[in-house]
Swiss-Prot record:
InterPro entries: Hcp1-lik_sf (IPR036624), His-Me_finger_sf (IPR044925), HNH_nuc (IPR003615), T6SS_Hcp (IPR008514), T6SS_Hcp1_domain (IPR052947). It comes from the Bacteria. This is Uncharacterized protein YhhZ. It comes from Escherichia coli (strain K12). Transmembrane segments: none annotated. Belongs to the hcp1 family. NCBIfam families: VI_effect_Hcp1. Pfam families: T6SS_HCP.
């Protein structure tokens, strides 16, 4: 069985059809936090063929829960309403977490068939078939895409949602304050905070206010991470790319870290008993074995002095270092060596720990939260390049 595909739909007449479809009122106990305004899609068929005379696009058929949108789709087919549709595909990444990796957008979409399936001992679902005039397919991780427009002369009549009737942030028009926030992220990403602030000032309006919302003495590092991810979406919608810098907080001071992966995770609070067992295993054997193995690598021998290497060979951490979980045990992190990094305490380990604590604050056991997450790259952090740069 495939992972759930999340669908957003906006109608030219009805506005946001998918709004509220992922809530408990719409789907009962199948509701999902973070996907309240999306439709849960279980299967999708996109039929394209070519007989030698050009490609033929036969529309898309998908299966979804019967939910809040069901009567609205009947309205759409009855009134021949033009729709704008977006399908977000998820998969399990190398960290064992869900990541958005594929996207299909349809414009000029019209419903051609609806079939309800109410069968004993099965989910109540409906299968919907749609035709379309424009399709965009993007692999968000591999950065490939395809688009097709059936009738180029009709492009301007294709319905495109605006900020008044579209709940999905992907299509909202940026106001000047939002532009300021993106400029702040650009300053972090490019290591030129003052230069980007100057640009915000020159734009006028509320741009500088938006900039200062992000980069001020009260800024939380996770807000910068979020803004940086938004920055990468400007040229490639919903692509989560590798970001090489992250602004964290330590004792009220901003710290710029390099060599960071920022990913989107679904943070799920782990039961305290399970957490205690994993922490006990880590303290008893895992940390020691990780350090012994790491001490045998050329990376460690080229970095630490003889005294620190001896400590590592005995399973002890070097002075001013700690072993850090990239994905925390409090969430879905494991004790696998791939999830561990030997990290310098000041300021690096404390910055990452502060970020994780901010995200986890207020989340109860079993609750979930979709959030950006900063991960130090490699097995030893910071990267050797950063150390060399700081000594120049």
């Amino acid at each position: 069985m495939s992972n759930i595909v999340y669908l957003t739909v906006t109608g030219e007449q009805q506005g946001s059809i998918s709004a509220g479809c992922g809530t408990s009122e719409s789907t009962g106990n199948r509701w999902q936090s973070g996907h309240e305004d999306e439709i849960f899609t279980f299967s999708l068929l996109n039929n394209i063929n070519n007989t030698g005379l050009g490609s033929q696009f036969h529309g898309i058929t998908f299966c979804k829960l019967i939910d809040k949108s069901t009567p609205l789709f009947i309205n759409s087919i009855n009134n021949n309403e033009q729709l704008f549709m977006g399908f977000d595909f998820y998969r399990i990444n190398r960290f064992g977490r869900l990541e958005k990796y594929y996207y299909i957008q349809l414009r000029g979409a019209f419903l051609s068939a609806i079939h309800h399936q109410i069968i004993e001992n099965q989910l109540d679902t409906e299968t919907i078939t749609i035709s379309y005039e424009f399709i965009l397919c993007q692999h968000l991780i591999a950065n490939t895409e395809f688009s097709y427009l059936a009738l180029p002369e009709n492009y301007n009549r294709l319905f495109l949602p605006n900020s008044k009737n579209q709940t999905n942030n992907r299509f909202k028009t940026l106001n000047s304050k939002a532009i300021g926030r993106l400029l702040a992220a650009g300053g972090v990403y490019n290591g030129n905070i003052e230069g980007f602030r100057d640009t915000a000032e020159k734009l006028g309006g509320d741009a500088i206010k938006g900039y200062d919302q992000i980069l001020n003495e009260k800024t939380a590092g996770i807000a910068i991470a979020t803004a940086s991810i938004l920055l990468t979406k400007r040229s490639n919608v919903d692509t989560y790319t590798e970001i090489n810098s992250y602004l964290g907080k330590l004792r009220g001071q901003q710290k710029l870290l390099d060599g960071i992966d920022i990913i989107e995770i679904i943070y799920i609070k782990r039961p305290s008993k399970d957490l205690a067992n994993l922490r006990k295993e880590f303290n008893k054997t895992v940390r020691k074995n990780f350090l012994i193995k790491l001490a045998k690598t050329s990376e460690a021998s080229g970095r630490f002095n003889a005294e620190d290497l001896l400590r590592m060979r005995k399973g002890n951490v070097p002075l001013n270092y700690n072993v850090h979980h990239k994905l925390s045990l409090d969430d879905g992190g494991t004790n696998d060596f791939e999830n561990l990094v030997l990290i310098e305490n000041e300021p690096y380990h404390k910055v990452f720990t502060n970020m994780q604590s901010r995200i986890a604050k207020g989340i109860l056991v079993g609750e979930s939260k979709i959030t950006p997450w900063a991960i130090p790259s490699g097995s030893i952090y910071p990267p050797m390049k950063n150390i060399m740069d700081h000594t120049k």
